[in-house]
Amino acid sequence: MIKLARSAGFCMGVKRALDIVLELSRTGGGPIYTDGPLIHNPQIIELLERKGIRSLAGRGAPSRGLIVIRAHGVSPERREALRRIGLPLHDATCPDVAKVQAIVNKYARRGYEIAIIGDRGHAEVEGLLGYSRGLGRVISGPEDVEALDRGAKVCVVAQTTQDVRLFQKLAENISARVSECVVCDTICRSTKERQREAIALARSVDAMVVVGGRNSANTARLVTICGETGVTVFHVESEKDCDALSLRHVNRVGVTAGASTPHWVIERVVERLGAILSLERRGATRCARLIGQGLIRTHLYTALAAVCLYMAACLFQAVPAQAPLALGLGACIICVHLAHRIAGRGLLSHGEETLTQEYYHDHRKSLSFLAVASGGLSLWIAARVHNVLFICYLALIVMGLYYSFEEKIGKCVRWNGGWSLRTVPASKDIFVATAWMVAIVLGPRLVAHAPWTFRATAACGYVFGLVFIRSIFHDLRTIHDDTIVGKETIPTLMGIRGTELILGGAMVGMCALVLASAIPMGLKIALAVPFAYSATYFALSRRRFAAGGVWCDALADGQFIMAGMSALIWSAAGQG
């Protein structure tokens, strides 16, 4: 079992700094230079360099472009030096760091000595010293406290990513030594939450894996903090380091990550750990895992989920389900979703893709054949059933392929003036939900020449809502990756909290729709089961019980399986 800390990965300050430089890179204006590495993570630095975002370190003053102050902040002297270069200057200093700078400046003006509890030489600490008017000193341990004058008046602040317990201990020592002491707890909330969760997680598992750059101070602190609980701790920078870990006889593994660690690195580590742990299991278990991964990665499982949702929609509308329509629907889903997965590789490339995305690249020829064969089968079935269904499936496949390969098509055919469907806010979520709704509800109903009823409208809303919820679940998992590659998904626009409110509202609204529909009470209960499942999945995902990679997709599709199975059970029992 793998448990992933909810706080693992980017903090607010890092995400904000990334958002700023990525937005600047999208709007143009020449090369972008950051005053030192934007964040302490080699994978992110490499990705930014490929986007033309480079560090000023080791370079002369640039003659064109713009300069960005990184999240760690800078001293007033350094800020003035950057201004003298003469290029536009943008400030990506973390707001929490800026607050500490203001506190240091305030008390330095009043003549207080400034005791900064932090790491000597760290960029944030060096910037804070610049605001201390020569009255600052770095406190890294008890020996530094002894150097303070007993008659001094001291203001104590902390590096925002400092060890909470070390800060409290040193602050108490300083208060006991000097005549006047003002203690300002400036450790940021995300750091406190990350450390608190890491300690709790470490106490509940057999081993801890901390993911992050070797030169990241906050990652190193997490390693130390977890180690103090007595659990075995491993520090890895990527999934390549996992193969050397000794995990024999380990049943529960906790995973956390530093504030500069991107999502795809965490997911690759979780996937690799899952594969390593599975090797310790019996042969039958390993075989079942491989079969499950194959079904999910080829989207056969997604096709089965779509068929289950189709059967639930038929029961919702009181129309009979037809085997040819179910088979054609499943084949159409495989074609479109596989094409999207195959085309998706390259948005994050050169090592930033997850192991699942890497799988689609390594097997792209065989998977492309499966996608083409599935598309052909769906169109052949549709043509034999009805011309309307053929046109419906053909339109869905063409639109799906265009959306997936739009970037490559645009390079060959310059007819859209540079406009991209991918840049339309929430376009993927709406497109996928609409496509499933058309294939599952509208197409079969047009074929049957059935009159349009309120229950048909409700069925459209039911299918659209469930697929929309599934799509947002996926977007929440990939929010940081989507921000980096410029995808305008709901989470990148609304933030995590705003998206969670939308999810909650969608679930409540869908339950209300089911209850308001003119269908028997038994079937109402059956059709409401998927929302209970989604709520449970959402609650567990917030706690970050990590399934990892493809298994997360399988769990999200589980609501469709539940919809079909529960509706069929109620129908077979004579309750619908």
Label the model's feature ranges.
Residues A331-G346, A395-G410, V438, Y462-R477, ...:
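Transmembrane alpha-helical segments that form the membrane-embedded catalytic/substrate-channel core
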Residues M1-A257, T261-W264, V270, G274-S278:
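The feature marks the mature, well-folded catalytic cores of soluble enzymes
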Residues T354, R422, A526-G576:
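Extended hydrophobic alpha-helices typical of membrane-associated regions
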